[in-house]
């Protein structure tokens, strides 16, 4: 790591700590040349591979925007949407891959959204899964009811 003060090509790590709820590492560094200290923050970049093959950085804001559309007219606040986006990011990061297909991001949204608001879930699932008939909705509603009636896992 280059020193930002004297541009010396090496530095020594003095202290490392988790930051941003475990999503980043904050390091205090010391330059052996000028003796000054500086801080770096390291994060692992998570990339989303779209259907077209284009790669873009994962964006919680994009998740919130997409889910907000499904929640339009529903009693869902911004805090709940931000928490859902965090859950989605945690789930896709847990896969351990630096690149994740966009359809896996959509799948990661479905579970938390179903628990948050069933109507919003149906709206999102109908677009995401490309529902084309009333039967598609009926099947999904039956699956929702089965999930709701299933005993909670302990």
From Swiss-Prot:
It comes from the Bacteria. A zinc finger (unnamed) spans 3-34. Transmembrane segments: none annotated. Negatively regulates transcription of bacterial ribonucleotide reductase nrd genes and operons by binding to NrdR-boxes. It comes from Mycobacteroides abscessus (strain ATCC 19977 / DSM 44196 / CCUG 20993 / CIP 104536 / JCM 13569 / NCTC 13031 / TMC 1543 / L948) (Mycobacterium abscessus). The gene is nrdR. The keyword Metal-binding applies. Keywords: ATP-binding, DNA-binding, Metal-binding, Nucleotide-binding, Repressor, Transcription, Transcription regulation, Zinc, Zinc-finger. Binds 1 zinc ion. Residues 46-136 form the ATP-cone domain. GO terms for molecular function: ATP binding; DNA binding; zinc ion binding. Its cofactor is Zn(2+). This is Transcriptional repressor NrdR.
């Amino acid at each position: 790591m280059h020193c930002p003060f004297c541009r010396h090509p090496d530095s020594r790590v003095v202290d490392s700590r988790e930051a941003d709820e475990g999503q980043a590492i904050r390091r205090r560094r010391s330059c052996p040349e000028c003796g000054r200290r500086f801080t770096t923050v390291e994060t692992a970049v998570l990339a989303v591979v779209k259907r077209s093959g284009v790669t873009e950085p994962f964006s919680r804001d994009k998740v919130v925007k997409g889910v907000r559309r499904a929640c339009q007219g529903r009693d869902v606040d911004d805090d709940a949407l931000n928490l859902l986006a965090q859950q989605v990011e945690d789930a896709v990061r847990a896969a351990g891959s630096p690149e994740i297909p966009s359809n896996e991001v959509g799948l990661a949204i479905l579970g938390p959204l179903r628990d948050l608001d069933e109507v919003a879930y149906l709206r999102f699932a109908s677009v995401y899964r490309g529902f084309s008939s009333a039967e598609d909705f009926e099947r999904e509603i039956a699956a929702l009811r089965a999930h709701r009636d299933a005993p909670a896992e302990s």
